[in-house]
Amino acid sequence: MTSFNSGRPVHVVIPARYGSTRLPGKPLVDLAGEPMIARVHARVSRALPGADIVVAIDDARIAAALDARGIRFAMTGAHHASGTDRAAELARVSGWHDTDVVLNVQGDEPLVPEALLKAFADFCVAAPDLGIATVACPVGDAALLDEPGIVKLVVDRRGRALYFSRAAIPFCRDGRSAGADLGGHLRHIGLYGYSNAALQALAHTAPCELEQLEQLEQLRALWLGMPIDVMRWPDAPPAGVDTPDDVARVVSLLKRQTQDETEPY
């Protein structure tokens, strides 16, 4: 494992669930010759060399693909409702200490920037009283404010989350004009860091009403009074993979990246 020169153990969990309504077998979807979960693991490994990286899985088919590539994995329960629950089980059975840092990197984000992963790991390790941490960037486009698939958030003066919503927050009472400054509007990026103590507390609490209404698990933490530190990032990373159309988009981007890397100068 790595402690990033802090003395605090850092673990990276990549949850990977085989079942998906929109894209069955999603972790094993072929992305330009490699299963998606292997590409995510490769990104994390390059960004955080020497880190304690574990893929938390629920299916023998994922295990076979990872084993063939020498990627460390752990089998977790098929009943988990979220990657957070899967990460919490792994941390619990592994005996990680309460103060250990646990980074949760989604297994369907094969294009997450390595610089973002490194910066976020450093951010979490540097927090002296880390409970939960996540990432936000400027919304950038006014059309996204009313898009429920884009989660918005507001923070306090210390940079801690006050609320997350699929609605446009903060609401502009006087209306939004074309070309209006969107500097006060933030969108959520789904990376999470926890102390293991906070992770276990979150996973052992039933969903709250706000979480169920918005379908946003992080609202459970706010409902419990747990602080969420928010790291600012300049822009949104490429979207993850949820549908067959997403697969085609990501494959195209990967092929373009490969071509750019191999073209002579």
Curated annotation (Swiss-Prot):
Positions of transmembrane segments: none
Coiled-coil ranges from the UniProt annotation: none
A GO MF term: 3-deoxy-manno-octulosonate cytidylyltransferase activity
Record's keyword terms, sorted: Cytoplasm, Lipopolysaccharide biosynthesis, Nucleotidyltransferase, Transferase
E.C. designation(s): 2.7.7.38
InterPro entries, per the entry: Cytidylyl_trans, KdsB, Nucleotide-diphossugar_trans
GO BP: any one term: CMP-keto-3-deoxy-D-manno-octulosonic acid biosynthetic process
SUPFAM superfamilies xrefs: Nucleotide-diphospho-sugar transferases
Pfam families in the cross-refs: CTP_transf_3 (PF02348)
Pathway per the UniProt entry: Nucleotide-sugar biosynthesis; CMP-3-deoxy-D-manno-octulosonate biosynthesis; CMP-3-deoxy-D-manno-octulosonate from 3-deoxy-D-manno-octulosonate and CTP: step 1/1; Bacterial outer membrane biogenesis; lipopolysaccharide biosynthesis
Keyword Transferase listed: yes
Localisation: Cytoplasm
One GO CC term on file: cytosol
Keyword Magnesium set for record: no
Substrates-to-products reaction catalysed: 3-deoxy-alpha-D-manno-oct-2-ulosonate + CTP = CMP-3-deoxy-beta-D-manno-octulosonate + diphosphate
Superkingdom classification of source: Bacteria
Function: Activates KDO (a required 8-carbon sugar) for incorporation into bacterial lipopolysaccharide in Gram-negative bacteria.
HAMAP family xrefs: KdsB (MF_00057)
Family statement: Belongs to the KdsB family.
Name of the featured protein: 3-deoxy-manno-octulosonate cytidylyltransferase 2
The organism of origin for this protein: Burkholderia lata (strain ATCC 17760 / DSM 23089 / LMG 22485 / NCIMB 9086 / R18194 / 383)
Gene label: kdsB2
